[in-house]
Swiss-Prot record:
Residues 1-16 form the signal peptide. It comes from Caenorhabditis elegans. Keywords: Disulfide bond, Glycoprotein, Hydrolase, Protease, Signal, Thiol protease, Zymogen. GO terms for biological process: proteolysis involved in protein catabolic process. Belongs to the peptidase C1 family. It is an enzyme of class 3 (hydrolase). The active site is at C133, H305, N325. The gene is cpr-6. This is Cathepsin B-like cysteine proteinase 6.
């Protein structure tokens, strides 16, 4: 008995010491200030400053944000299609109830490993030259949650084009939108299927081609200098999609909600229902992210960006979130990035939204679904 008590004390002491160390790390970043001169840097000067003044992540010139746009800041920052990254007062009135669950939260979690049957979780899409991140973050997480709710039986890709072009309450299409409004639209109006431009599958595939975002020459054409105009809302499927009509192809949500701006609340929701849409503030240095755990180090604020949260972990004592971006697979860590967790870095823990698929609609589809996959590596 004494031995067990002694061992228990050791475990508790180790746990407390670990938490104390973690808090001291977080305090360092929570209370930091960005040097005023660093905040004004851009281009090679900013990249050099980032790489010389911290060791959590590396910066590298990204072709899309340098040679393509150059000084056209309006076009460059137009890709950041979220005006307000934090949940509004109204958005906080309807929060996920998973925050009240009694769950053991692991040190690390990855949706790709937890739900291996769901191919959509692994997919990186490309928003091209359109400020449609708010729509991509939404349909990506919705697609994942449909698969998870159906225990891997329904593998679908919801259409970013359908949401982007037809949700008038969401905002301004390629000029930005509201993530929570996108999830509410899913509940009220439903969203049809639609793959990326290259795969060209589903009812409404994405209308804009992938383009070169990156630091080295790729097989994609350079991104257009200006943003694409918002597509016209077409409430019909493309001509070569004959599986279902537009209305028959829709998937609906049962609920849409915000998630409390608390690390454990976010983790519980992610563990329970799957990937989430999150928004955060993008600074100039983030555009040049090439790997590691991102912390804002320099450069000016450009705008708000929406992405898909899939997990978390710790790297050499630094806690992070794992996130899927929509700038293709050659950006960052194969299209993903990691960002400091626990200090609301760039507001990333203050604008988390999600929802639940409408289960009765999923059940009826399971009886006639043929497991048609619409994923393609050629994004």
């Amino acid at each position: 008995m004494k031995t067990l008590l002694f061992l228990s004390c050791i475990v508790v002491a180790a746990y407390c010491a670990c938490n104390d160390n973690l808090e001291s790390v977080l305090d360092k970043y929570r209370n930091r200030e960005i040097d005023s001169e660093a905040a004004e840097l851009d281009g090679d000067d900013l990249i050099d400053y980032v790489n010389e003044n911290q060791n959590l992540w590396t910066a590298k010139k990204q072709r899309r944000f340098s040679s393509v746009y150059g000084e056209n800041d309006k076009a460059k920052w137009g890709l950041m299609g979220v005006n307000h990254v934090r949940l509004s007062v109204k958005g906080k009135q309807h929060l996920s109830k998973t925050k009240d669950l009694d769950l053991d939260i692991p040190e690390s979690f990855d949706s790709r490993d937890n739900w291996p049957k769901c191919d959509s979780i692994k997919v990186i899409r490309d928003q091209s030259s359109c400020g449609s991140c708010w729509a991509f973050g939404a349909v990506e997480a919705m697609s994942d949650r449909i698969c998870i709710a159906s225990h891997g039986e329904l593998q679908v890709t919801l259409s970013a084009d359908d949401l982007l072009s037809c949700c008038k309450s969401c905002g301004f299409g390629c000029n930005g939108g509201d993530p929570l409004a996108a999830w509410r639209y899913w509940v009220k109006d439903g969203i049809v299927t639609g793959s990326n431009y290259t795969a060209n599958n589903g009812c409404k595939p994405y209308p804009f081609p992938p383009c070169e975002h990156h630091s080295k020459k790729t097989h994609f054409d350079p991104c257009p200098h200006d943003l694409y105009p918002t597509p016209k809302c077409e409430k019909k499927c493309v001509s070569d999609y004959t599986d279902k009509t537009y209305s028959e192809d829709k998937f609906f949500g049962a609920s849409a909600y915000g998630v409390k701006d608390d690390v454990e609340a976010i983790q519980k929701e992610l563990m329970t229902h799957g990937p989430l849409e999150i928004a955060f503030e993008v600074y100039e240095d983030f555009l040049n992210y090439d790997g590691g755990v991102y912390v804002h180090t320099g450069g000016k604020l450009g705008g708000g960006h929406a992405v898909k949260l899939i997990g978390w972990g710790i790297d050499d004592g630094i806690p992070y979130w794992t996130v899927a971006n929509s700038w293709n697979t050659d950006w960052g860590e194969d299209g993903f990035f990691r960002i400091l967790r626990g200090v609301d870095e760039c507001g990333i823990e203050s604008g988390v939204v999600g929802g639940i698929p409408k289960l009765n609609s999923l059940t009826s589809r399971l009886h006639r679904h043929h497991r048609r996959h619409v994923y393609d590596d050629n994004y």
